[in-house]
């Protein structure tokens, strides 16, 4: 009798809990995709999709957005123009992630009326309807205006994205909402004369507050040192880190060959 009760309880709990776990897996899991690698159009705009060569329809993958800078385009992110291809993240993913590089409107991310957020929402729906994605493991990164767009995602889609990495960003794509916690990494040059360093601190401070971190001074490297200093905030509900480096408004902090931003971003994403 006791055995029967325990078995019934176990089965009841299994039925109750299974949808919770299933929610993390996208509708594309277990299906053969109708979407291939390459350029796709949606709602009159384009994005580039890169799926691992060993893709398994039954395995859930990370989903990573790489957002280009002002005057750039998705091809610059894919090929690596002034940056490592895919901001250096595809190499570090080792086949564990699906990558998306969208094209901004008029070579930027003004996000007027939330149109760029809506564009990324549509991409997510299309990609996840075709491929197996862990919906609790979406990420975004970008430089300059791409950083501003990553920040806008952190503001309005904190519940849909796990973490963002903002490279020399500014408040240039808006911040609708902006009250929810999300894992937030900022990387900013102390000599940035386009989107000033202090502005990057202000962006990060929103998530220091949202994530209920203990306040801390942002540490900086010495000018001319060609080095970086990292500040990890403590007591956060979700991690917040700020990397200050000796440089300006650079798509690739400390140079294209430097592993600083790619390593820090990928490790931060995986630890978030």
UniProtKB/Swiss-Prot annotation:
One of its GO terms (cellular component) is extracellular region. Residues 1-22 form the signal peptide. Its main location: secreted. Glycans are attached at residue 34. It is found in: Secreted. It comes from the Eukaryota. Keywords: Carbohydrate metabolism, Glycoprotein, Hydrolase, Polysaccharide degradation, Secreted, Signal, Xylan degradation. It catalyses: feruloyl-polysaccharide + H2O = ferulate + polysaccharide. The keyword Transcription does not apply. InterPro entries: AB_hydrolase_fold, FaeB/C/D, PLipase/COase/thioEstase. Gene3D superfamilies: alpha/beta hydrolase. GO terms for biological process: xylan catabolic process. It holds the Pfam family Abhydrolase_2. GO terms for molecular function: feruloyl esterase activity. Its EC number is 3.1.1.73. It is an enzyme of class 3 (hydrolase). Belongs to the faeC family. Involved in degradation of plant cell walls. Hydrolyzes the feruloyl-arabinose ester bond in arabinoxylans, and the feruloyl-galactose ester bond in pectin. Active against paranitrophenyl-acetate, methyl ferulate and wheat arabinoxylan. This is Probable feruloyl esterase C. It comes from Aspergillus clavatus (strain ATCC 1007 / CBS 513.65 / DSM 816 / NCTC 3887 / NRRL 1 / QM 1276 / 107). The gene is faeC-2.
């Amino acid at each position: 009798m006791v055995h029967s009760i325990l078995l019934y309880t176990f089965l009841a709990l299994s039925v109750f809990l299974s949808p919770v776990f299933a929610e993390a897996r996208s509708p594309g899991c277990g299906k053969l995709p109708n979407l291939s690698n390459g350029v796709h159009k949606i709602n009159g705009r384009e994005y580039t999709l890169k799926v691992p060569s060993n893709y398994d329809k039954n395995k859930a993958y990370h989903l990573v957005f790489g957002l280009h800078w002002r005057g750039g385009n998705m091809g610059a992110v894919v090929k690596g123009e002034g940056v490592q291809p895919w901001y250096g993240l595809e190499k570090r993913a080792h086949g564990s992630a699906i990558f998306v590089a969208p094209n901004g409107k008029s070579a930027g991310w003004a996000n007027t009326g939330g149109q760029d957020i809506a564009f990324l929402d549509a991409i997510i729906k299309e990609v996840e309807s075709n491929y197996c994605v862990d919906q609790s493991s979406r990420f975004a990164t970008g430089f300059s205006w791409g950083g501003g767009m990553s920040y806008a995602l952190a503001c309005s889609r904190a519940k849909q994205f796990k973490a963002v990495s903002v490279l020399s960003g500014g408040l240039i794509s808006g911040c609708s909402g902006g009250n929810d916690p999300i894992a937030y990494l900022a990387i900013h040059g102390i000599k940035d004369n386009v989107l000033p360093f202090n502005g990057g601190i202000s962006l990060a401070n929103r998530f220091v507050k949202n994530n209920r971190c203990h306040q801390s001074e942002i540490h900086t490297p010495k000018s001319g040192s060609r080095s970086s200093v990292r500040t990890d905030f403590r007591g956060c509900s979700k991690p917040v880190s700020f990397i200050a480096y000796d440089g300006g408004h650079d798509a690739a902090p400390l140079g294209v060959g430097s592993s600083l931003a790619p390593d820090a971003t990928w490790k931060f994403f995986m630890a978030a």
